[in-house]
A protein has these predicted regions:
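A glycine- and charged-residue-rich anion-binding loop/surface
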Residues: 1-189
Length: 189
């Protein structure tokens, strides 16, 4: 009502019926999307998005090895063209640390490690040492993705079947995201 009133003062007309229709469509899409499964913010499950999603697990593992166990994923954003990965770390990465991280991810890719999906109770996954970013978003039964001895994480997927499918990993940029959080932008070639 307020919107219509303000629009009227400006000589504009509001398509109330059109708005109601679009709002109802949005509500229905939201209902369909909330099936109780957490997808980790991945909007699309195309081939490249799937590859980048698996690459985030390898990058997380490599960062822990290069920078230390204080590293934890803080977020990610994946498109068909690139990946963005936010992680806890107090300082800018050196060129050597970036090179070591990139080389380690590429080593994991060349190792052709099978990617296994395991289903189990959330508490059992945590006892196994599986990492979980948004633990409250998962149900009682979770999917855990195991990439050899490299990575073990709760995740909604999707993932490639083998790390060899990823191609070559390249860090394009490393920058501050917020206090104590760094951001890596990377591509697969």
């Amino acid at each position: 009502e307020l919107t219509e009133e303000l629009a009227g003062e400006l000589g504009l007309k509001v398509d109330t019926e059109g708005f109601k229709q679009k709002f109802a469509e949005h509500q229905e899409k939201s209902r369909q999307g909330s099936t109780g499964k957490f997808k980790g913010g991945l909007a699309s499950t195309g081939e490249m998005e799937t590859k980048y999603h698996t690459a985030t697990h390898l990058l997380n593992a490599a960062l822990k090895k290069v920078l230390g166990p204080h590293v934890h994923q803080k977020g990610s954003n994946i498109t068909a063209e690139r990946m963005r990965f936010d992680f806890s770390h107090p300082a800018k990465m050196t060129d050597e640390e970036k090179k070591q991280t990139e080389d380690l991810v590429n080593e994991y890719i060349k190792m052709a490690i099978p990617v296994e999906k395991l289903e189990m109770k959330k508490e059992d996954a945590l006892k196994m040492g599986a990492e979980a970013m948004f633990i409250d978003k998962y149900g009682d039964i979770v999917s855990v993705y195991k990439i050899g001895d490299v990575s073990l994480e709760l995740c909604g997927g999707p993932h490639v079947k083998n790390t060899s499918e990823l191609g070559h990993f390249k860090i394009k940029k490393e920058e501050a995201s917020s206090a104590g959080v760094r951001r890596i932008k990377a591509i697969l070639e």
